[in-house]
C-alpha cells in the first residue's frame, strides 16, 4: 500500500474532556504519523464551509453548533493506506455500532458527539487538508 495523507479532526466533545493526547496516541499506535496539527476554535462560517456538503441535511444546524462549541484539533496524518487506516481506527459514526477498541467505541458520547472526523477518500482528504493547512504547515 502507498504512503498517503489524510485529514483528521478531534472534535469539541473530545477536546473538552482532554482526550486530544489519548486519541492522537491511538492514531500513532496504529502506525499513522502526525505531520501537521493545530488547535482551532471554529467560527460559524468555518464550520458551515467545512461541512457544506451536509447543508441540506436535517442535522446541519446541530452539527454547526457542536463544532463551534469549543476547540477542535485539526491534523494531517501520514502513513501506508492512511485514509482507510484512520477510518478503521475511528470506528463507525454511531459509537453503538463501532468495533471494540476504536476511538468512537472508547471515547464518543453519542452519534452527534462522536469525537472525531476523518476523510473518506483521497479527493476529500486533499480538499479537507487544504481547507485548514497551507503547504508550509505540513512538515513530513
From Swiss-Prot:
One of its GO terms (cellular component) is cytoplasm. This is Nucleoside diphosphate kinase. ATP binds at residues 11, 59, 87, 93, 104, 114. PANTHER family: NUCLEOSIDE DIPHOSPHATE KINASE (PTHR46161), NUCLEOSIDE DIPHOSPHATE KINASE DDB_G0292928-RELATED (PTHR46161:SF3). The lineage of its organism: Bacteria, Pseudomonadati, Pseudomonadota, Alphaproteobacteria, Hyphomicrobiales. Its main location: cytoplasm. It is an enzyme of class 2 (transferase). GO terms for biological process: CTP biosynthetic process; GTP biosynthetic process; UTP biosynthetic process. Belongs to the NDK family.
